[in-house]
């Protein structure tokens, strides 16, 4: 916990500094509160991190650069930084004693959870390894040829890579938990000082027991949830009289969400609506909007082309115009992203092709205990929220949020209908009901009760084998005494690794029998041998070095002759 606390302090100073840099870089006078200033710093750092990753990894050179920029901004904005910190301290001192105690409890619970071991399959499949590749090489040419999931390299992983401090002996994985703590601090302070329909974020502490399960690993889903909460907060607060500065901030946040994960596409409903409402849009306004869009789209396409060879990954649109050696072969791309494989998490390809729509719907609904809870919640909210809006909040802004929700569900239905890609809407609608229908004293009691649930899950972690349908399960993350000082490892896989040669590629593979897609935490390049031999046997492809003697030159998929396959 102590080591994590030190990393949190550095993250705070960096985001604070880059918030000022973001205002300067995007040339806008954002009227933002203390929390959104730090979120602006986060997306500014993510933007700069993407630019850096085109040329190098987040190694010692980057951290010298980051330290230099931090020192420079701290000198230039030293007065503003001092005022910022004083304002935060004054706000904390001003709140009531019971709120201070609650805030202190939340602080230690989030810190303890952050120092614990994370146990998620996606973390073992590609989160850990994606961050390691970013640390070592930045955006790596043809990385998707080694593991199809690496094509998803997220902006959230870029950020976590920056703060993983790979040159140390510790396993840092704490950005998500730190951002959750910031949101909680804002919520508790605002809970007493301001109370209005636009301040939905004050209800956030009641969701800590769920949100912490997203932050214990570097899940891009938490990045989407965080940005979504901020965007809806700004949208409701400024809907009646939007200005170009607020619109531009919401637009930046929406673009940033797309760099994190394409499931953030539903966010674009909000800037589109505000764009229509803003009057007197100047030529300068349109040029700024267009140039910002081109920069972000260019970064997104460039990253995709380097890693997978598909400009609009996870779509294969226009990929035929890019005849590049390191492009993931179409057969492997289709294996991972064709419709029956996108539904594989709840049905086999045969079931997708043979079952009726109702039978598929039922399998999706009842896939597991946790899926059943969230899937039923999504369906209920589709039916209940319109009635709630009509009865209590019959205003256009709330209907637009619901429209975004329906659009997101339609998008997921034709791509990958997993509840976690729409869970942000469950959170925001739950917060609306919580804020508008629960009394202030009852709110505080629920805040406190929610932290008891967090404490219980720290001491007795969720056993996902009891609520999940996945055939492979990891040991639950348990807080240990040594975690008071040192953070737990990033990986739950306790396996030795052996070196295997396949053609000109030398790779590490776990000796222990692990999940088909999982790699764990080991030296690069790392690949589950079962996975390699599966694609070799069924598709006649193996990953190979572009340059026989230099891994840094990239990877491609080599087509084998059937007679050479053993």
Residue ranges of predicted features:
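Membrane-embedded, hydrophobic transmembrane alpha-helices
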Residues: 1-89
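Hydrophobic, aromatic-rich transmembrane alpha-helices
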Residues: 17-24, 177-193, 353-395
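Membrane-interface alpha helices of multi-pass inner-membrane proteins
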Residues: 48-53, 212-213, 246-273, 292-295, ...
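Hydrophobic alpha-helical membrane-interfacial segments at the cytosolic entry of transmembrane helices
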Residues: 96-109, 278-305, 449-455
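Active-site lumenal/periplasmic loops and adjacent helix-entry segments of GT-C-fold
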Residues: 110-196, 215-217
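Membrane-lumen/periplasm interface segments of specific transmembrane helices
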Residues: 115-118, 287-364
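Signature aromatic-anchored transmembrane alpha helix within multi-pass, membrane-resident enzymes
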Residues: 245-253, 289-294, 440-473
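Intrinsically disordered, polar/acidic, low-complexity terminal segments
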Residues: 321-348, 450-566
């Amino acid at each position: 916990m102590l080591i994590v606390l030190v990393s949190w302090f550095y993250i705070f100073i960096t985001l604070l500094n880059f918030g000022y840099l973001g205002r300067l870089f995007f040339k806008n006078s954002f009227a933002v509160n203390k929390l959104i200033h730090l979120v602006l710093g986060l997306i500014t750092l993510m933007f700069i991190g993407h630019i850096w990753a085109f040329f190098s990894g987040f190694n010692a050179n980057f951290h010298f650069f980051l330290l230099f920029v931090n020192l420079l901004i701290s000198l230039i904005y030293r007065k503003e930084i001092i005022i910022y910190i004083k304002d935060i301290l004054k706000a904390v001192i001003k709140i009531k004693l019971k709120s201070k105690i609650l805030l202190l409890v939340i602080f230690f619970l989030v810190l303890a959870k952050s120092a614990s071991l994370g146990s998620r399959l996606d973390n073992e499949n590609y989160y850990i390894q994606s961050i390691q590749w970013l640390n070592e090489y930045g955006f790596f040419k043809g990385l998707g040829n080694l593991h199809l999931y690496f094509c998803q390299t997220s902006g959230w992983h870029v950020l976590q890579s920056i703060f993983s401090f790979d040159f140390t002996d510790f396993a840092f994985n704490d950005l998500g938990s730190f951002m959750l703590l910031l949101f909680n601090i804002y919520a508790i302070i605002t809970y007493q000082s301001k109370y209005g329909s636009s301040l939905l974020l004050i209800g956030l502490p009641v969701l800590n027991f769920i949100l912490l399960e997203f932050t214990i690993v570097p899940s891009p889903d938490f990045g989407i949830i965080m940005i979504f909460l901020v965007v809806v907060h700004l949208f409701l607060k400024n809907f009646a009289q939007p200005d170009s500065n607020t619109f531009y901030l919401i637009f930046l946040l929406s673009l940033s969400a797309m760099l994190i994960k394409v499931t953030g596409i539903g966010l674009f409903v909000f800037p589109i609506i505000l764009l229509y409402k803003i009057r007197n849009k100047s030529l300068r306004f349109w040029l700024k909007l267009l140039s910002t869009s081109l920069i972000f789209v260019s970064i997104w396409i460039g990253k995709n082309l380097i890693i997978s060879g598909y400009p609009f990954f996870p779509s294969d649109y226009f990929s035929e115009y890019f005849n590049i050696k390191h492009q993931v072969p179409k057969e492997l791309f289709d294996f991972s992203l064709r419709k029956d494989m996108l539904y594989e998490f709840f049905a086999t390809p045969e079931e997708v092709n043979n079952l009726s729509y109702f039978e598929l719907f039922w399998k999706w609904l009842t896939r597991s205990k946790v899926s059943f809870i969230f899937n039923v919640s999504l369906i209920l909210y589709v039916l209940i929220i319109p009635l709630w809006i009509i009865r209590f909040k019959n205003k256009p802004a709330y209907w637009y949020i619901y429209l975004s929700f329906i659009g997101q569900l339609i998008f997921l239905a034709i791509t990958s209908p997993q509840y976690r890609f729409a869970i942000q809407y469950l959170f925001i609608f739950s917060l609306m009901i919580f804020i508008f229908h629960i009394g202030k004293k009852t709110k505080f009691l629920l805040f406190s009760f929610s932290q008891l649930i967090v404490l219980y899950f720290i001491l007795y972690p969720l056993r996902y084998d009891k609520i999940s349908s996945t055939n492979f399960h990891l040991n639950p993350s348990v807080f240990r005494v040594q975690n008071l000082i040192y953070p737990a490892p990033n990986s739950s896989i306790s396996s030795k690794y052996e070196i295997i040669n396949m053609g000109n590629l030398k790779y590490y593979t776990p000796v222990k029998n692990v999940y088909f897609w999982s790699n764990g935490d080991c030296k690069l390049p790392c690949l589950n041998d079962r996975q390699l031999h599966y694609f070799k046997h069924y598709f006649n492809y193996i990953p190979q070095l572009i340059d026989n003697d230099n891994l840094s030159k990239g990877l491609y998929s080599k087509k084998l002759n059937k007679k050479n396959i053993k």
